[in-house]
Amino acid sequence: MNEKSLRVLEYFKIKDGIKKYISTSAAKKLIDELEPYGSLYEVKEHIEETKEAFELLMKKGAPPFEGAYDVTEAVSMAEKGFSLAPGQLLKVGSMLRCARKFKEYISHKEEEESYRIIEDICSGIIPLKNIEDNIFNAIIGEEEISDKASTALYSIRRSLKDKNASIKDKVNAMMRSYSKYLQENLYTIRGERYVIPVKAEYKAQVPGLVHDQSSTGATLFIEPMGLVNLNNEIKELMLKEKAEIERILRELSALIYKSIVAVKNNEKIVTELDFIFAKAKYASSINATAPHVNDKGVIDIVMGRHPLIDPAKVVPLNIYMGREFTSLVITGPNTGGKTVTLKTTGLLEVMAMSGLMIPARENSTISFFKEVYADIGDEQSIEQSLSTFSSHMTNIVRIIDDADEDSLVLFDELGAGTDPTEGAALAISILEALRKRGTKIVATTHYSELKAYALKTENVENASVEFDVETLRPTYRLLIGIPGKSNAFEISKRLGLSDYIIEEARKGISKDTLEFEDLIQNLQTRSVKAEENLRKAEFLKEQAEKFKEKYEEKVSSITETREKALHEGRREAKKIIEEAKSEADKILKDMREMERLGYSSEARQRLQESRQKLKEKLNNAEESLNISERDQGEALKSVKEGEEVFIPSLNMKGIVISTQDSKGEVGIQAGIMKINVKLKDLRKTNNNPISKKEKAVKKREARLNLKSVAQSIDLRGLDSEEAIYKTDIYLDEAYMAGLGSVTVIHGKGTGVLRNAINTMLKKNSHVKSYRLGNFGEGGTGVTVVELK
């Protein structure tokens, strides 16, 4: 794609906007290299990957990029066999953890929606938890190694601690004995050796080694001879500690070296995911959608918005071309929004061709072009001494030389900057030359001659930007099919120009021209009314949709309540039946006891008959319950449009409005609801409804499957009581969603909130274990909870 067009369309500002959402500098490099792709397949795939990331953001919240660092340099050093610093190792460990957690982030149940491209990328991740654990167990901070890094280091540091305690006791004793010679009763350390501050005039009274003196020379820092051996022992231990730390770092670096291919692979994937999710986050910030893409030259942008204009001020744009016409000529007065229309169209095109979602309504369509050429604005060069006209013409000549049927050309004020008659004629010739090649064109102009050209030329359509004569302001709405009108007379009249002057001016214009302008005015008025009617219709449609949603919610609520009541009733009935059976068995036992004690067999016979009748009634009642729960009706092997079917999960009948699709789903009109139901879940209408119990279970399963739970909860700003309440609910949802571990963000602060949360976690039945966050996870500001 030619850089000039990208520059005038302000494409690079879009890339700057995306960079705000990256986590690694390696991903920033990918954004710097981003440009429109060279094939339809690439464009579709990259839009789809952005859309998948966007949907994951909406469903699962922020991806696990905490602690995702650019480790390119560290990995390169490890590959060459160098020993890495603690900070570098921590960053590599964080990157590996980020990669592993991404596999958990995209995991889903079999029946839930899959994300083909993102899952395919993540399938290449090779979890290296062993390396992660070794790094995080050994290294606490960028300059701090854990005592647990090795048994040798633990032993050395324990010895150091003991030696330091011994030397402190000894130096304190010496200070007491030398107190009258000291500047102050405080020991200090110089060159990693314990020393005491002796007044210069008493240095002979304290035998030892002089290590330093104060700035005034009044104090000498002396290491008493009695401390020399202990200081030497401490120095030896410190050297051993340093050597052991270097050995540990070499060992950890060697672990990375052994798995360098997998480490580099994971680093590359994390960088790619960072890039993809940055695109998705930017899409969310501009309220973007994924457009359809074709290679037929068809553009249909619905309510498109320029992403760099303030959302509160931007006017949505509707523009289409490529079916009935391939060239669009936008005419009308200056400052009417023609250039914004041109830039919006071009920018949304190159955004989509770069795999980005665009700020427009769902189902907008963008065409793939091999090149987008733009001649917009005044980019004349002072050094080249080019006039406005010459500057534009130089660019236009280049466009005419290169543009073909797979190109989109955007002209702003074509033919301007020279004599109007010649400029208009030249503009028509340029448009006609490109049109004959099949080039797709959007051009703006204020020449009336181009209106006539568009009216009489095949595949060329007029358009204008609406102007409100009442307020003397443009509305910036594009009216396709209606040429622009200058409105000079109306504007002049409203600004106070005398009527007789305006009438004299009218006489200077031909009757045909005036009639044509009046026709344009009438068309614009009708278009405005049509727009108003359309907006009213859309408003009514939205209201109807809201009413439908409320109705469905009420129906669902009523159905759920009814099912719950029926389920409870059946459960209670079963309980009564079981109790009655137990009572009947007790009666029989009593009868046998009576017979044993000598009561007549006749009495026993009557009791036996009574018991049998009771048992039969109970069995009949139980069987009727079981039948109603068991009998769901006969399954359907196929359906046809217009057929009446029964939907057990809703306990409703419906009419088939579309037959089975590739997913095995059938379109059903059930009351006012239009729903898709799996064919296997439909029954013939002459069968009994599904049991309320099973229906309730299915609804619960559906709700669980649809519900998404974030990987973390943020409690900052809440008091302890509210935080505990929210965390308790969140842990229930996370457990039901099958999450393995979650993060509770409570902040560092005074520790009150953290302690309250930890106390609650000890008692929660879903919690297997919990710990404070490691480096890159949030440290003591978060608690990582592992669920059962």
Curated annotation (Swiss-Prot):
InterPro entries: DNA_mismatch_repair_MutS_C, DNA_mismatch_repair_MutS_core, DNA_mismatch_repair_MutS_sf, MSSS, MutS, MutS2, P-loop_NTPase, Smr_dom. Keywords: ATP-binding, DNA-binding, Endonuclease, Hydrolase, Nuclease, Nucleotide-binding, RNA-binding, rRNA-binding. ATP binds at G332, P333, N334, T335, G336, G337, K338, T339. SMART domains: MUTSac, MUTSd, SMR. It comes from the Bacteria. The keyword Lipid metabolism does not apply. One of its GO terms (molecular function) is endonuclease activity. GO terms for biological process: mismatch repair; negative regulation of DNA recombination; rescue of stalled ribosome. Its EC number is 3.1.-.-, 3.6.4.-. Disulfide bonds: none annotated. Residues 713-788 form the Smr domain. Belongs to the DNA mismatch repair MutS family. MutS2 subfamily. Homodimer. Binds to stalled ribosomes, contacting rRNA. PANTHER family: OS10G0509000 PROTEIN, OS10G0509000 PROTEIN-RELATED. Endonuclease that is involved in the suppression of homologous recombination and thus may have a key role in the control of bacterial genetic diversity. Acts as a ribosome collision sensor, splitting the ribosome into its 2 subunits. Detects stalled/collided 70S ribosomes which it binds and splits by an ATP-hydrolysis driven conformational change. Acts upstream of the ribosome quality control system (RQC), a ribosome-associated complex that mediates the extraction of incompletely synthesized nascent chains from stalled ribosomes and their subsequent degradation. Probably generates substrates for RQC. This is Endonuclease MutS2.
